[in-house]
């Protein structure tokens, strides 16, 4: 497992580092809280 950063779709800040299995090929998307936007927004895996 390796850690990948999650980036907010709205403001683009990297808020979270989450573990991901290396055998998954699709990009991870989660709804998480963004402290810059002060709201729950979609966060996508960035490289």
UniProtKB/Swiss-Prot annotation:
UniProt xrefs under NCBIfam families: PRK00504.1, rpmG_bact
Name of the protein described by the UniProt record: Large ribosomal subunit protein bL33
PROSITE patterns recorded: RIBOSOMAL_L33
Alphabetical keyword list: Ribonucleoprotein, Ribosomal protein
HAMAP family registered for this protein in UniProt: Ribosomal_bL33 (MF_00294)
Record GO cellular component, one term: cytoplasm
InterPro entries associated with the record: Ribosomal_bL33, Ribosomal_bL33_CS, Ribosomal_bL33_sf, Ribosomal_zn-bd
GO MF annotation list: structural constituent of ribosome
GO biological process, one term: translation
Domain of life: Bacteria
Family under the similarity heading: Belongs to the bacterial ribosomal protein bL33 family.
Pfam families: Ribosomal_L33
